[in-house]
């Protein structure tokens, strides 16, 4: 709900320095003002001030006064940052001859609102407050989006973040400018994708971005089916919460990790061919962990059709070994992509995984390779690994249960 403009005075309580240190014309701009008007309070400050001149000097003086961190971000453009324990405050020299000209260069009207603390005055030349009231994201000007094409993708991210709609004229421009997204640095694009992939509200906006051609360059193999599957992953999360006990839910989400949901969705966006998918992810500068996670999901998925009907212990053993710690990510992906008749089997796999004592998902070796070398005098070779695998499978099947039986079993296998 939109707060009365008078409530902006509450921002004073959050200011981490004496307002008297600000030049009279200094204004807070951007997301901090927008969020205050929406009644959204941030635990960690991320503020931006615009000043007519002396931005670096102002930041330096405040940092010195409070023994805070100080970084010159862009000397040529006169931008500096003060780092406090609970947030950062950036100071930038205004672009243009006036504050209004500076605001006219911003991306969306809701981000082109300024607040002057000393005058307790809101400056809104782009009518951004009205768009906040309408819950609408509207461009300031098409040229502003063209000048920094990352803003094209940011439109969908901010619509998801704020739970806003996109102004129809703005969306038309986004479609027209979509090919320009390929000129943006991969790291910047990845950061925007990560928010959309990691948020339940991001799924519908990823679909919208795909429909508008924004994803075409980076995820050329994405189609309507894969975008719908991303939405189904959100439903899969709800199903998992309903199916598992409280303890199992905690185990699952701990194993999944903070990025697990985003990784399962990412696997839906890339090509199903593992090699092509690797290229797509490397181009976007994804980490080795994210790359390996997606590889495991895509390699494991085709095996489900072979496993669903009476799989052998051997088949399941190798399946769990290959997926390893990525099984929770796989489960999310599989629940979203598989026909419903596979779901009970997928939950069986998850039940095995969540039981730390389950021999199938978490084999407990009876002996080591060193035991085979020392006690059976087997020379180091690939045979060691093969024997250990067969011993693990025999243990799961109940054929052997202790070290002596394992050694005897290995000795017998070595003869054959």
UniProtKB/Swiss-Prot annotation:
A Pfam family this protein belongs to?
A: PolyA_pol_RNAbd
Q: Biological process (GO) annotations?
A: tRNA 3'-terminal CCA addition; tRNA surveillance
Q: Could you say which residues bind CTP here?
A: 31-34, 106-107, 111, 148-157, 188
Q: Which UniProt keywords apply?
A: Magnesium, Metal-binding, Nucleotide-binding, Nucleotidyltransferase, RNA-binding, Transferase, tRNA processing, tRNA-binding
Q: Which cofactor does it need?
A: Mg(2+)
Q: Identify the InterPro entries for this entry.
A: CCA-adding_enz_C (IPR032810), NT_sf (IPR043519), PolA_pol_head_dom (IPR002646), PolyA_RNA-bd (IPR032828), tRNA_CCA-adding_enzyme (IPR050124)
Q: Which GO terms describe its molecular function?
A: CC tRNA cytidylyltransferase activity; CCACCA tRNA nucleotidyltransferase activity; metal ion binding; nucleotide binding; tRNA binding
Q: Where does Mg(2+) bind?
A: 46, 48
Q: Which family does it belong to?
A: Belongs to the tRNA nucleotidyltransferase/poly(A) polymerase family.
What is the protein named? CC-adding tRNA nucleotidyltransferase
Could you tell me which species this protein originates from? Synechocystis sp. (strain ATCC 27184 / PCC 6803 / Kazusa)
